């Protein structure tokens, strides 16, 4: 049976699973869908065309599904889609997409979103991502699986942050961070491979060694980006555990529109 506090407002049209819990003074809009066993904290607002999957935990005073902070927005029915088992802590803001992009902001599964985080319109956040307190994502930002964003960091619009990368606290990021790389500073610069994170996630010593070699080619050997990519492609075909992650790094660099941190 759905547990809805008597002071909460659930507008007609909202689709709420019977196992959902909604706390005091929370507001759920008419175009919202909430999946099984999700908990909505007190005073939080879930609005817009928002879909929440199963087993999510929304902290008190969170604002989820609000209008995009884009002056071109004209009340189009753009969306926010959130997966399963996400923790979204107090005072977080997550906005719906815009028609200038795909019209949807997405958050995958098993993410840990700490207090006061902002996820802007059209962002695409993968799975198992950690966004530390007060991390701020501008519109159209992409964050790969298992990335970690330090507290008080600011990320420029359209920036891509690769899988398994890490951005240090209080950083200002204006260009893409390749997968597996640690970045920090204002403005953010590369600081090596995220070795400890890769070990924790089961990457083999050979794969980590290959990624360290890739990092040296990209950042330490004095090569131009085009020269580095030629040698990176050779490294990605060496026939070891490192082939796949190095190939993923090369593909990310090839696809960069804003350029990578250097």
UniProtKB/Swiss-Prot annotation:
InterPro entries: Acetyltransf_C (IPR029098), Acetyltransf_C_sf (IPR037157), Hexapep (IPR001451), Lipid_A_LpxA (IPR010137), Trimer_LpxA-like_sf (IPR011004). Keywords: Acyltransferase, Cytoplasm, Lipid A biosynthesis, Lipid biosynthesis, Lipid metabolism, Repeat, Transferase. It is an enzyme of class 2 (transferase). CDD domains: LbH_UDP-GlcNAc_AT. GO terms for cellular component: cytoplasm; membrane. It is found in: Cytoplasm. Its main location: cytoplasm. It catalyses: a (3R)-hydroxyacyl-[ACP] + UDP-N-acetyl-alpha-D-glucosamine = a UDP-3-O-[(3R)-3-hydroxyacyl]-N-acetyl-alpha-D-glucosamine + holo-[ACP]. Transmembrane segments: none annotated. Pfam families: Acetyltransf_11 (PF13720), Hexapep (PF00132). It comes from the Bacteria. One of its GO terms (molecular function) is acyl-[acyl-carrier-protein]-UDP-N-acetylglucosamine O-acyltransferase activity. Pathway: Glycolipid biosynthesis; lipid IV(A) biosynthesis; lipid IV(A) from (3R)-3-hydroxytetradecanoyl-[acyl-carrier-protein] and UDP-N-acetyl-alpha-D-glucosamine: step 1/6. Coiled coil: none annotated. One of its GO terms (biological process) is lipid A biosynthetic process. Homotrimer. Belongs to the transferase hexapeptide repeat family. LpxA subfamily. This is Acyl-[acyl-carrier-protein]--UDP-N-acetylglucosamine O-acyltransferase. It comes from Burkholderia vietnamiensis (strain G4 / LMG 22486).
């Amino acid at each position: 049976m759905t547990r809805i506090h008597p002071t909460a407002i659930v507008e007609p049209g909202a689709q709420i699973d019977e196992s959902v819990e909604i706390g005091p003074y929370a507001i759920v809009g008419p175009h919202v869908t909430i999946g099984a066993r999700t908990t909505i904290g007190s005073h939080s607002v879930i609005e817009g065309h928002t879909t929440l999957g199963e087993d999510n935990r929304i902290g008190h005073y969170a604002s989820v599904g609000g209008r995009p902070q884009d002056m071109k927005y004209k009340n189009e029915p753009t969306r926010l889609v959130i997966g399963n088992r996400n923790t979204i802590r107090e005072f977080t803001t997550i906005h719906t997409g815009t028609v200038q992009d795909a019209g949807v902001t997405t958050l995958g599964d098993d993410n840990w979103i700490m207090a006061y985080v902002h996820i802007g319109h059209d962002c695409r956040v993968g799975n198992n991502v950690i966004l530390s307190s007060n991390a701020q994502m501008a519109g159209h930002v992409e964050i790969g699986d298992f990335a970690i964003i330090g507290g008080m960091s600011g990320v420029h619009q359209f920036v891509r942050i690769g899988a398994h990368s890490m951005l240090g606290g209080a950083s200002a990021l204006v260009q893409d961070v390749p997968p597996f790389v640690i970045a920090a500073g204002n403005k953010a610069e590369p600081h090596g491979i995220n070795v400890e994170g890769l070990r924790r996630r089961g990457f083999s010593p050979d794969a980590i060694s290959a990624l360290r070699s890739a990092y040296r080619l990209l950042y330490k050997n004095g090569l131009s980006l085009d020269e580095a990519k030629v040698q990176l492609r050779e490294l990605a075909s060496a026939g070891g555990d490192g082939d796949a992650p190095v190939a993923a790094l090369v593909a990310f660099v090839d696809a960069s529109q804003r350029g990578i941190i250097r």
